Amino acid sequence: MNDTTGRIPLWIIGTVTGIFGIGLIGIFFYGSYSGLGSSL
């Protein structure tokens, strides 16, 4: 329990980064296909 206090497990970092990356790419492509990508 004391090991996770100052250090985040690697699988949590990978999962959060993966979800954030997929969401960001999805929003980017959705905006570009909708015509809002140029305004952003």
Swiss-Prot record:
Keyword entries, A-Z: Membrane, Photosynthesis, Photosystem II, Plastid, Reaction center, Transmembrane, Transmembrane helix
Membrane topology label: Single-pass membrane protein
Alphabetized Pfam families for the sequence: PsbJ
Protein location: Plastid membrane
GO biological process: photosynthesis
Entry GO CC: photosystem II reaction center; plastid membrane; thylakoid membrane
Transmembrane segments annotated in the record for this chain: 8-28
The UniProt record lists the keyword Ubl conjugation: no
Role according to the record: One of the components of the core complex of photosystem II (PSII). PSII is a light-driven water:plastoquinone oxidoreductase that uses light energy to abstract electrons from H(2)O, generating O(2) and a proton gradient subsequently used for ATP formation. It consists of a core antenna complex that captures photons, and an electron transfer chain that converts photonic excitation into a charge separation.
Family membership: Belongs to the PsbJ family.
Subunit field text: PSII is composed of 1 copy each of membrane proteins PsbA, PsbB, PsbC, PsbD, PsbE, PsbF, PsbH, PsbI, PsbJ, PsbK, PsbL, PsbM, PsbT, PsbX, PsbY, PsbZ, Psb30/Ycf12, at least 3 peripheral proteins of the oxygen-evolving complex and a large number of cofactors. It forms dimeric complexes.
Record-given protein name: Photosystem II reaction center protein J
Native source organism of the sequence: Cuscuta reflexa (Southern Asian dodder)
